[in-house]
Amino acid sequence: VSAVDGAAVADRFVSEIEQVEGLRCLPLNRTLAAMRSLGMTGVRDLTQAYTLMRTLQADGLVLGTVTEWDPYKPLRFGAAIEVVSAAEGSDRRPLDLKELTMPTAESIGGQDSSRAAMSQASRIFDGRSHETLQELERYSMGRAAPDSGSGERAYEIRIDLFTRFGAFVLLRDLLEQEAARLGVPLVDGKAERVP
């Protein structure tokens, strides 16, 4: 049994977000450093999410969990992700650490769970599934090194590349959900990168 390296998986998501035109993502190490400074080992609720967003001065936070992990062929990767967005008109001032001693909604900018702005996506990518393999083939075209021994099949045998593929698909799904939530039109209703 192989343990999941959560930081490596999160880095795949950061990399994929950075490739979306118009989006910027803070480096994972900066987010982890901010969490350590706040005494957080994870983001367990919206209060913590909004506190972290204010500390980072970020517009949103992508949270996720790995739901399936098998790094041996046939590869299997599953994840659930969500984006928590800062509410319109929310307080963008840097977090005053004294506020952390007052755990009320008002002390974190008035955010509460009844006004949470979120979009979610989840999937399981199974290396035995015909649907997954077809989507993986479309994704790997032009991305694989043609001079490597495994070529495009590298995405079927290397968990790091398979996870990158999963991150791409999940983020595409998440962007489509977020666009629908915000009423932003997408070309053909899809959040696809232009080649």
Residue ranges of predicted features:
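C-terminal/domain-edge helix-coil "capping" segments
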Residues: 75-76, 87-195
